[in-house]
Amino acid sequence: MSLSKLAKQIHTEEGPKWWVDLETGLPKDRNPGEMLMLIVSEVAEAMEGVRKNLMDDKLPHRKAEEVELADAVIRIIDYCEGRNLDIAGAVEEKMAYNRNRADHTREARLATNGKKF
């Protein structure tokens, strides 16, 4: 499935939970900062899973790291769809840009003060 199609599916399924006022059924104006921090919290939960080598409590056959990162991806994609951001196009462009980034080369990373991670 393409990222664009996945984005539409995620927003169709998740959108009513986050973008609609549960009491009125009307569209809800979400705080972008709050939503971005919810993404950060999913990544933090993934880190906790790595740190403690945990399995997920809801999907016990999967590592917590994997499930929390899936939550982060779902939140990112839903956020982008809800704010009319072309995440698929941005990912494609960013990957193309990164292919030729001077600071991503082996030589640049090995250089003094090069990116180590």
Residue ranges, per PLM feature:
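Flexible "arm" and connector segments at domain edges
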Residues: M1-F117
